[in-house]
Amino acid sequence: MAVLSTLKELVEQLIDPYLFMGIAMRFLPSTILEAIRNGDFSTLLSPSKFKEAWWGNFWAFIGPQVKASAENKVIPLLEGRVKNGRMGDEVVERPINGVVLEIGAGTGMWADVFAKVNVGVNPEEDELRRRKGESGLTRVYGIEPNPKSAATLRRRVKEIGLDGVYEVVPVGIESINDPKAWDGRIEPESVDCIVTILCLCSIPEPEKNVKLLYQSLKKGGRWYAYEHVRIDPSRGFFLRAYQS
């Protein structure tokens, strides 16, 4: 049974990336038609602009599905209910608070979770946080360089009442402290928390940009990560070989 279970998981892992790419291909014709209808020929003639528009349309569809499959792990993480990789019902670590940097914010699919955590996991936890002198979220910077996703993110922020707390930063990680790239600047050692959810696998120059993110953290700052990782050796040879 263990072998069959491993083979089943192997087949699923082999198929999933191709299903993902197949779904993305479905949005290619509609992105072309959208640009033609809008008379946006500069997008059609620019590979980089077209890629951004295509990705924005695709992610608006697939993002909520990604959230649905991950939120049972991500929400406890942000609420401080995860310790040593184990989830529980009690708050055992500090929830996100203060100034937060959300990387790859997309269309705002996690913004409602930020709004929930901002008022505490429950009344008792909220009261405890106040007694300790800790605040909720004072500022959230959502890093989203895709123009289409950033526009949707701004609308989402207003819908859930985080306008004035959540600021959309429409540039990549490499430009977060460059006031010429956007209307603001995130200073080194000014951020309390960083949140990355299934995004570090797709950022450019990961080593350089991860180092830049670390530099933005205050001393004692916290990084909340839910990412693709190297498969556990106990999962079997086939899955490890496929990932390699």
Show which residues each predicted segment covers.
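N-terminal auxiliary segments of SAM/dcSAM-dependent transferases
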Residues: 2-49
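Class I SAM-dependent transferase core
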Residues: 36-82
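Conserved alpha-helix/loop element of class I SAM-dependent methyltransferases that forms part
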Residues: 64-98, 109-117
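Class I SAM-dependent methyltransferase SAM/SAH-binding core
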Residues: 99-101, 106-178
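A short acidic, Gly/Pro-enriched loop at the edge of an enzyme's catalytic core
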Residues: 178-194
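A short SAM/SAH-binding and catalytic strip from SAM-dependent methyltransferases
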Residues: 192-205
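A short glycine-rich, Lys/Arg-flanked "PGG" loop and its adjoining helix->strand segment in the class I
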Residues: 207-219
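Conserved class I S-adenosyl-L-methionine
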Residues: 222-244
